[in-house]
């Protein structure tokens, strides 16, 4: 069942989104060679809790981390651990924040220092596909309009869309109906209505779309070992069109601490 939200409830989700975006900004400032993914996780959890929120992922279906940290060919659901970032890596950071009972969910894939042109194209093309999908999140459109826009933008950049992983509704729970595929046909699928809130999240690879499960039962990898990217917004469908609740611009209220404080956080 699709649960629609009132404007007041969407505002509450946006406040969770403010904390989430500030968390991603904090982590971006820490991403450099030699930093371990568990250090990023520790800094994220500390920051989220300092803002009166909780990390949604921690304990969700037994997941042990506060964030998902997925480097290189790992597409999603990476458990933070001892892996230390290297120059030339790409790393997806997926964060969920719960504030006053409402969830926001977003992800970005970051380069570690300088990356080659294929990786630059991977990140830029996947982010463009996210924005293409968001632009279709309007009342009266169909889910297939969103899915097709994502697919067209990603494949137009020469990327493979991972078909076995999808976006989803979000609200008081992290995963709600409907599913949001990253491929499809315009005019097909559920009708988009005012009050729906969706996690739009293209996941792509620079190679083939097939995936494999990692040995820990969580991490999902590109089967061919090609680098992968994941970008995600939480988006509310309003009468005026899409409202991104996790934009890269943060509010002053939830702004991250200065860089010197970030350096002490982990």
Predicted stretch roles:
Residues 1-266:
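Active-site neighborhoods and metal-handling regions in enzymes and metal-associated proteins
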């Amino acid at each position: 069942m699709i649960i629609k939200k009132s404007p007041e409830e969407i505002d509450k989700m946006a406040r969770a989104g403010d904390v989430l975006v500030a968390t991603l900004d904090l982590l971006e400032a820490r991403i450099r060679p030699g930093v371990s993914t568990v250090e990023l996780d520790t800094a994220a959890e500390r920051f989220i809790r300092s803002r009166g929120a909780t990390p949604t992922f921690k304990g969700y279906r037994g997941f042990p981390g506060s964030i998902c940290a997925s480097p290189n060919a790992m597409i999603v659901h990476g458990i933070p651990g001892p892996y230390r970032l290297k120059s030339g890596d790409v790393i997806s950071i997926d964060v969920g924040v719960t504030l006053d009972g409402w969830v926001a969910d977003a992800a970005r894939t970051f380069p570690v220092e300088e990356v080659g042109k294929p990786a630059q194209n991977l990140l830029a093309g996947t982010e463009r596909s996210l924005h293409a999908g968001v632009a279709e999140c309007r009342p009266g459109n169909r889910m297939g309009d969103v899915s097709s826009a994502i697919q067209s933008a990603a494949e137009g950049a020469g990327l493979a869309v991972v078909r076995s992983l999808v976006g989803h509704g979000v609200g008081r729970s992290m995963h709600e109906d409907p599913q949001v595929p990253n491929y499809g046909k315009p005019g097909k699928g559920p009708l988009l209505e005012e009050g729906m809130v969706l996690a739009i999240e293209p996941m792509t690879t620079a190679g083939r779309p097939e995936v494999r499960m990692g040995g820990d039962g969580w991490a999902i990898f590109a089967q061919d070992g090609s680098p992968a990217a994941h970008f995600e917004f939480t988006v509310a469908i309003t009468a005026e069109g899409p409202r991104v609740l996790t934009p890269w611009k943060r509010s002053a209220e939830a702004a991250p601490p200065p860089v010197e404080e970030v350096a002490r956080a982990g």
